[in-house]
Amino acid sequence: MNATTIIGIAGGSGSGKTSVTNEILHNLEGHSVALIAQDYYYKDQSHLTFEERLKTNYDHPFAFDNDLLIQNLMDLRNGIPVEVPTYDYVNHTRSAETIAFQPKDVIIVEGIFALENKTLRDLMDVKIYVDTDADLRILRRLMRDTKERGRSMESVIEQYLNVVRPMHNQFIEPTKRYADIIIPEGGSNKVAIDIMTTKIQSLINNQQ
């Protein structure tokens, strides 16, 4: 089997990571690509009451089961299919359903803490940080969490001010220094995305 290229895409909540990822996916047509969201790996909280789950800080590195993510990536790189967990954002715990992933030429890992864990970083061939102004990030998060995750506007704003913003400044922003490339303005920066895609395609060709 050909070697697998692993790409990490990090950045604050609402920074445009998904837009950058989609642009890269579009530019890598012709290659087999798997997209794994770090959000799949929020820790199982079924042992906690619902009230206790509501107190969970989802913007802290400890909220993620990085050990499982790392193991899944190692298995995929070794040609072993994996079952990736999913998360129930309404009930705040891991879902019973899993997603089957097959080994691919390229694996993209996308999440706010994709570059925070050293062991995880060491598996990556390319590390990307998406950098976007805070005011735009909060607007995007507000729209996403109210529409897709069943949250009220008030709860999203309160969480941003009390948790998301301080956690971003403490844990996410510093991971920028680990990036091979920093993409300003999210998915709208076509030049940076094209440069990154060229680098990724070169890596893929060298590993085949």
UniProtKB/Swiss-Prot annotation:
The keyword ATP-binding applies. InterPro entries: P-loop_NTPase (IPR027417), PRK/URK (IPR006083), Uridine_kinase (IPR026008), Uridine_kinase-like (IPR000764). It holds the Pfam family PRK. One of its GO terms (biological process) is UMP salvage. It comes from the Bacteria. GO terms for cellular component: cytoplasm. It comes from Staphylococcus carnosus (strain TM300). Pathway: Pyrimidine metabolism; CTP biosynthesis via salvage pathway; CTP from cytidine: step 1/3; Pyrimidine metabolism; UMP biosynthesis via salvage pathway; UMP from uridine: step 1/1. NCBIfam families: PRK05480.1, udk. Keywords: ATP-binding, Cytoplasm, Kinase, Nucleotide-binding, Transferase. ATP binds at residues 11-18. CDD domains: UMPK. One of its GO terms (molecular function) is ATP binding. It catalyses: uridine + ATP = UMP + ADP + H(+); cytidine + ATP = CMP + ADP + H(+). Its EC number is 2.7.1.48. HAMAP family: Uridine_kinase. This is Uridine kinase. It is found in: Cytoplasm.
